[in-house]
Every structure is written in structure tokens, then in C-alpha cells.
Regions:
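Walker B catalytic acidic pair
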Residues: 130-131
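Inter-Walker segment of RecA-like/P-loop motor cores
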Residues: 69-125
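Mg2+-dependent endonuclease catalytic cores in nucleic-acid-processing enzymes, primarily RNase H-like
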Residues: 307-437, 456-468, 473-484
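Pre-P-loop entry segment of helicase/translocase ATPase cores
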Residues: 1-29
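Walker A/P-loop NTP-binding motif
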Residues: 42-56
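Conserved RecA-like ASCE P-loop NTPase motor core of nucleic-acid helicases/translocases
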Residues: 58-70
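ATPase catalytic-site recognition across NTP-hydrolyzing enzymes
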Residues: 215-288
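ASCE P-loop NTPase helicase motor core
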Residues: 134-216
Length: 484
């Protein structure tokens, strides 16, 4: 906050900086503000919550993942709310501000997924999420259902702030950042069926408003050294927190990951490549992770003469909502897999080696999933995969490491959109710091891990050599691999 100023003979408690003003002027249903540290996100959020406090039945909610994280936000409201509304009262037991009109702003948390049911039956005209990437999609979407009016003439909307990273990084990026350039309104038409059979169509809007420390002149004036603090961070954190880079963030498991369209053809210094014809003598693997309410995942991999694996096709049982399965039973999944292999020229007529989550062989509650899928007419055969988690994670690291020639030992066709979406977004578990967080959308990771464990690599002997930046003959661009 800038030093106190006067306007019309009255003190100015707070005034928005340009990026904050852009955020607060938006009219969409959902707005995400941020992308980097120090942009003044939290200040804008707690001030935005005041917009309707003159309406007696207005109810607002500001939420963080855990309650201790709310302390700073509550301190901000003490600094801002009381001078503007001297008769407003904060109740430390209920964590609620009550304003002279009767309007209320609550502070809440959702430390565990089941905590979302603490808000069951509640209605909030405004919901503000601070650090949205700390929440799962299930938590966010449930609270969206609580975003409804408490009476006439209130505006009903949600606002959120975030930095890259955290368990929710993937879905937040997919919902707000990836679909459109920053500052571009996204429109979604949603449908519902009325009891009389009528189809009701409504319009939902959302937008991402970026912000970095460079947008916070007040902070840089009060603490010029903060810019240096961010610039001195390790590279991944620096990219995320200084520049708001959503492709690099703290806690990312596979920091080796690189998706460079400029090298899709020469296959160097990128894990994503353009599809090519698979030679007939290459071995084909099929990995499988079963899911019902969560997505199931099938990946097909080709192995070349050097032991390099290529993910050439995928089948992902997702509704389009992050981490939500299509609820297909085991036999239907087997039929979908068989149809893919019969219709895809890369797979038709091939001998395919299937490896799957050992859990599908469980017979404790009747016929196993593996047995159901092996029956006529699908005849899918699976071998139980090696479920050793840390060894499997290390195989991922070994495979993703670039060799001296710029080629890794695992590459992915650019048609495998869900692999490309989910693998870079995996973060470490807070309780088991060597493993990934299993509450994420990790189904593709699991089925790939089973295939990697069937084709283990030794640790790379040497660090990869990065290409020389000075390449006047453009030899790197001209190099290309041809398949015969």
C-alpha cells in the first residue's frame, strides 16, 4: 500500500495500482489474477470482497487452503476494513466481519477434501480464493456450487489469485491460462434439462489477468531489494515467481520435461515429437491403469533398437473435467482398447505386450478385472506391472534425461495430448517428499511407469551436453532422423 494520501480532504486508505484495477474492473463469472509473486494479489482480493457490503443480506467468503495461511489476509482486513467502516466488527471465533448494514464477510479454509462439506447448504454472493493452485478441482468446483445469491440485487461471482505450482497447478492452468491469451474472455455455454424437458442454455465467462512484481510499484518503492530476492531464486522458482511462467514451478517433479515444437522433426532437445511410421519389427507395449470414477489410462509404446520408447497413442477415459472418469465398466474399457488396436494402422495386426496395475488381478471381491477383460470377445491379456513407486519414478527421470546428442530415451507423439498435459504438472507429495502427490491426475504417470519398469534403464553415466548457442551454419536445424 502506498503512503497515505488525501483526496477531497479525506485520507485514502487504499487505491488500486493499474494491474489491480484491471482485475477489479472485470465482469466475468470467474477471474484468476496473478501468475507471479509480489503483484498485489491478496490486497486486491480482500478489497474486492467489500464491493457489496452496503447490502444487508450480502455474504462473502475468502478462503485459503489452511486456516493458518489466512492470518496474513485477516491482518490486511484489520488494516483496511476498520478505517473505512469504523462500526464494523470482526469476530475471532466465527472468523467473520459484520458490517453496519448487516452484511458479512467470512474467512474459511479447506485443509482436507472432506472439509468442503462444511460449506454444504451455505450461500455466498462472493467467493474469493487466495492461492487457487493449492486447491484441487473437486474443492473449487464444489464451492462454485455455493456461489449463489442470498437475496435480491446482489452480484454473484468468484475471484481467485494464484502463483504457478501446487497440487492444483494443472487444472488451474488448463482452465484459465492455456485456452486463451491473457486478458481474453473465455465463454462457455452450459446446458441443463428442465423437468418439463426444455433445454436451458446459459453463458458462463472467465478470464486470466496476469500480474508480476513489476506491476506493484508500491512494493518496489518500499522494498527495492525484493526484485533481487526473486531474481536470486533457483531457475524454476525464478521463472514462476518473477515472471509468472506456468511451465516452470516450485515442486515440479519432472523438471527435465521440454516441449519444443521447433524440434518436433529433428527430435533433439524435446520430449514431444511429430508422429512417424513405426517399423514393423519394433516391439509394442501397452500400459494400463484402471479407473471408474477417476479416469482410466491406456498408453501404447514402441521400442526402437536402442531401447528408446515412444508413446505413440493414448486412450484416456476422462469426461473433459479434470480427473473425472467416464465410469466405463471393465468390459467396456476392454472393448474400447480392442477397437483402438483394430482400427489404428500403427497397431493393427501387431503383437502387443500388455502390462497393468497389479490391482486389476485382485479376486477378493469376485472375478478380477483382468479376468473380465481376457474373455471373449476382447481377449485382452495383461501381465501385472511392477508397482515399486520410487524405482518407477527414477526410471522416468532416467528416460527423460537428455543424452549428449540431445535425445532422451522417452519421447511422446504430439497427438498424446493428455500425457503432455498431465506429466509436466505433477508435484511432490508433502507427506512423502520423494514421491509424487497421488491426489493429482496421475493415471497416465502410473500406466507409463509400469511400461518403464518392464524396460529398465541404468542411470545415465554423464550429464547431457547442451547445444552450442552459436551455430552459424545451422547444423542443428538441418539434422534430422529418418525411419526406414
Amino acid at each position: 500500500m502506498a503512503a497515505q494520501r488525501m483526496r477531497d480532504g479525506r485520507p485514502v486508505i487504499w487505491s488500486p495500482q493499474p494491474a489491480q484495477a484491471r482485475f477489479m474492473q472485470r465482469t466475468e463469472n470467474e477471474v484468476l489474477y496473478g501468475g507471479a509473486a509480489g503483484g498485489g494479489k491478496s490486497d486486491a482480493l480482500v478489497i474486492e470482497a467489500l464491493r457489496q457490503v452496503e447490502i444487508p443480506h450480502y455474504r462473502g467468503l475468502i478462503i485459503r487452503k489452511t486456516f493458518p495461511q489466512l492470518r496474513e489476509l485477516i491482518d490486511k482486513t484489520m488494516r483496511y476494513y476498520k478505517p473505512v467502516f469504523p462500526k464494523a466488527r470482526y469476530n475471532g471465533s466465527t472468523h467473520c466481519w459484520t458490517f453496519p448494514s448487516g452484511a458479512k464477510i467470512y474467512f474459511g479454509s479447506m485443509n482436507h477434501a472432506q472439509d468442503r462439506y462444511n460449506y454444504q447448504g451455505q450461500a455466498y454472493d462472493f467467493i474469493g480464493f487466495d492461492e487457487l493452485t493449492h486447491f484441487t478441482w473437486e474443492e473449487y468446483s464444489y464451492l462454485l456450487s455455493r456461489n449463489r445469491p442470498n437475496g435480491p440485487d446482489t452480484r454473484v461471482y468468484t475471484r481467485a489469485t494464484a502463483n504457478p505450482g501446487g497440487i492444483g497447478h494443472g487444472w488451474v492452468k488448463a482452465r484459465f491460462v492455456s485456452p486463451a491469451p491473457p486478458g481474453t474472455r473465455m465463454v462457455q455455454m452450459v446446458k441443463a434439462r428442465a423437468p418439463d424437458g426444455r433445454e436451458i442454455v446459459q453463458r458462463r465467462t472467465r478470464i486470466f489477468i496476469p500480474s508480476t512484481v513489476f506491476d506493484n510499484a508500491a512494493l518496489l518503492e518500499n522494498d527495492p531489494g525484493y526484485l533481487g530476492t526473486l531474481a536470486a531464486l533457483p531457475e524454476a522458482e525464478k521463472k514462476a515467481l518473477l515472471y509468472g511462467d506456468w511451465d516452470s514451478f516450485t515442486g515440479q517433479v519432472f523438471t527435465e520435461w521440454k516441449n519444443d515444437p521447433a524440434h518436433y522433426d529433428d527430435q533433439r532437445w524435446t520430449h514431444v515429437i511429430r508422429p512417424f511410421r513405426i517399423p514393423g519389427h519394433w516391439k509394442i507395449w501397452r500400459g494400463y491403469d484402471f479407473g471408474y470414477s477417476k479416469p482410466f489410462s491406456v498408453g501404447w509404446y514402441a521400442a526402437d533398437e536402442e531401447g528408446r520408447l515412444y508413446r505413440i497413442r493414448e486412450l484416456y477415459g476422462c469426461t473433459g473435467t479434470p480427473n473425472e472418469g467416464i465410469k466405463a465398466d471393465p468390459v467396456k474399457q476392454a472393448r474400447m482398447i480392442r477397437e483402438a488396436e483394430e482400427n489404428d494402422p500403427m497397431l493393427r495386426g501387431r503383437t502387443i505386450l500388455g502390462v497393468a496395475d497389479p490391482a486389476i488381478f485382485n479376486e477378493s471381491q469376485g472375478e478380477s478385472i483382468a479376468a473380465m477383460q481376457e474373455k471373449s470377445p476382447n481377449f485382452l491379456h495383461w501381465a501385472p506391472g511392477d508397482h515399486t513407486r520410487l524405482a518407477g519414478k527414477m526410471q522416468f527421470h532416467y528416460r527423460l534425461a537428455f543424452q549428449a546428442d540431445g535425445r532422451p530415451m522417452l519421447q511422446v507423439f504430439n497427438t498424446c495430448k493428455h500425457f503432455i498435459r498431465t506429466i509436466p504438472n505433477l508435484v511432490y507429495s508433502e507427506s512423502n517428499v520423494e514421491d509424487i502427490d497421488t491426489d493429482q491426475e496421475d493415471h497416465i504417470y502410473d500406466e507409463c511407469r509400469y511400461v518403464l519398469m518392464e524396460n529398465p534403464l541404468s542411470p545415465p553415466r554423464t550429464e547431457p551436453v547442451q547445444p552450442m548457442p552459436d551455430d552459424p551454419l545451422e547444423l542443428g536445424k538441418k539434422a534430422r532422423f529418418f525411419r526406414v
